[in-house]
Design a protein with these regions (language model features):
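A glycine- and Lys/Arg-enriched "phosphate-lid" helix/loop adjacent to the NTP-binding pocket
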Residues: 2-28, 38-90, 137-144
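NTP-dependent small-molecule kinase module
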Residues: 90, 97-157
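Functionally constrained cores in energy, signaling, and assembly domains
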Residues: 43-46, 57, 95, 118, ...
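Conserved alpha-helical scaffold flanking the Walker A/P-loop in AAA+ ATPase domains
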Residues: 29-37, 93-96
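Arginine/glycine-rich "motif VI" loop of SF2 helicases in the C-terminal RecA-like domain
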Residues: 37-41, 98-101
């Protein structure tokens, strides 16, 4: 599981030669290429965007500010970043659209109600595991005889 905070990405200082008008197109292409490589190697990728509404984000921020045990989760900069809500939503939409593939799909999960979010994410993971069609390997007759022999030897010692 990887968790990325957008404000950290934005604050990232990029070397000047990397900054071009095509930087995001190039990065999205690289993300798709890396994910394509990983899925060819057998890695299962499921990307989940937890979509918290602006109203719910505000409510959670106020709860954090009222509760001393939760204040560490809040940054004063969060208030400034909320002013750019539309820009963040547009950036998320662009990134998700540009990097979703059959092999590495995005799932956008409503996240205002934590119980529902957890249930939806659990179902996505269960479905991904089911798709692996995992099963206990069948033992050949020779392997079964070897195990039986090993069992007899263990009992004798």
């Amino acid at each position: 599981m990887t968790r990325v905070h957008p404000e950290l990405l934005e604050a990232q200082q990029l070397p000047k030669p990397l900054v071009s008008k095509h930087i995001w197109r190039d990065r999205f292409e690289d993300i798709r290429a890396i994910e394509r490589y990983l899925t060819r190697q057998g890695t299962v990728i499921r990307k989940i965007f937890l979509n918290v509404s602006k109203a719910e984000q505000r409510r959670r921020f106020l709860v954090r500010l009222r509760n001393p045990a939760k204040r560490w989760k809040f940054s004063v900069n969060d208030v400034n970043e909320r002013l750019r809500w539309k820009q963040y939503m547009a950036a998320y939409e662009e990134a998700i659209s540009a990097t979703t593939t059959v092999e590495a799909p995005w799932y956008i999960v409503p996240a205002d109600n934590k119980w529902f979010t957890r249930l939806a994410v659990a179902q996505i993971l269960i479905d991904a595991l089911d798709d692996l069609n995992l099963h206990v390997p069948e033992l050949s007759c020779r392997e079964q005889r070897a195990l039986h022999h090993a069992q007899r030897r263990l009992r004798a010692t």
